[in-house]
Amino acid sequence: MAALEEKASQVAEWLKKIFGDHPIPQYEMNARTTEILYHLSERNRVRDRDVNLVIEDLRQKASEYESEAKRLEDFLMESVNFSPANLSNTGSRFLNALVDSAIALEIKDTSLASFIPAVNDLTSDLFRTKSKSEEIKLELGKLEKNLTATLVLEKCLREDLKKADVHLSAERAKAEGRLQNMDFLKAKAAEFRFGIRAAEEQLSSRGMDASLSHRSLVALSDKLSELKQQTIPLKKKLESYLDLMPNPSLAQVKIEEAKRELDAIEAELTKKVDMMEL
C-alpha cells in the first residue's frame, strides 16, 4: 500500500509538471491506472535525462568547435592574411552555414571526407529514431486499449458487485424472516407441548385411563394400521375357503369362524378409532 501511494504521488508530480498551468484531465485513480502512468512517467524521466545529457554534450562540443573555429580563424589570419570580415554577404552566409553544419554534425572539420560519413550517420539515426517512434506509438496504442478494456471491465465488475450486494441483502432479509418464523414455530411448539402436558396431567388427575392419552392414541393408531395390514392376508385366506368344495359344512364352519374373528378385529378397531376421535 505504501509503494502504491508513493507511485501515485510521483504520478501526480509528473502530471503537474507535464500540464503546467493547464488543468490535469480527470481520471479514475486505481492500482491499474496508477501503475500505467507510473511506467510512462519513468520512461519520460529517462528520456528527459538522456535529452539533457545530449544537450550538455552538444554544448560542450559547440564550445570545442567555437574554440577550434577561433584557432582556425587565427591560423588563416596569420597564414594568408584572410579575415571573415573581408567576405561578401553571400560568402559570410555560406561560411556560417558551413560552420553550423559542422557543429550540428559533430565533425572535426569541414572537409568532404568528414561531411559524407556524418550525413550517413545522421540519416541512419533518423531512420532508427523514426522506427523507435513508431514502436513507442504502437506501445502507447496498446496501453490505451488495455487501459480502456480495464476500465470497462472494472465498470462491469462494479455493476456486478452492486447486483450481488442487492441480491445478498434480499437473501439476508429472507433468511431473517425464516429465522423469525422458525423462532415463532419453536415457541408455538413449546406452547403446544406445555398445553398437552397440562391437559394430560389434568385428565390424569380426574382418573382418565392412561391408554386414552395422546401418545397412547397415536400408538393405537399405528397399531390399527398394522392390524389392518394383517387383515389383508386373512381376507385372502377367507376367499380361498370359499372355493373349497369337498366338505361344504366344514368349510362353512371355517368361514364363520374367520368371519367372527374378522368382525371382532374390526369391532376392536372401530372402538379404538371412536375413542381416538373423542
Curated annotation (Swiss-Prot):
Record's keyword annotation contains Cytoplasm: yes
Protein name: HAUS augmin-like complex subunit 1
Family of this protein: Belongs to the HAUS1 family.
Keyword Protein transport: no
Subunit annotation: Component of the HAUS augmin-like complex. The complex interacts with the gamma-tubulin ring complex and this interaction is required for spindle assembly. Associates with microtubules. The interaction with microtubules is strong during mitosis, while it is weak or absent during interphase. It is unclear whether this interaction is direct or indirect. Interacts with EML3 (phosphorylated form).
CC terms in the record's Gene Ontology section: centrosome; cytosol; HAUS complex; mitotic spindle microtubule; spindle pole
InterPro entries: HAUS1
Keyword annotations: Cell cycle, Cell division, Coiled coil, Cytoplasm, Cytoskeleton, Microtubule, Mitosis
S-S pairs: none
Gene name linked to the record: Haus1
GO-annotated biological processes: cell division; centrosome cycle; spindle assembly
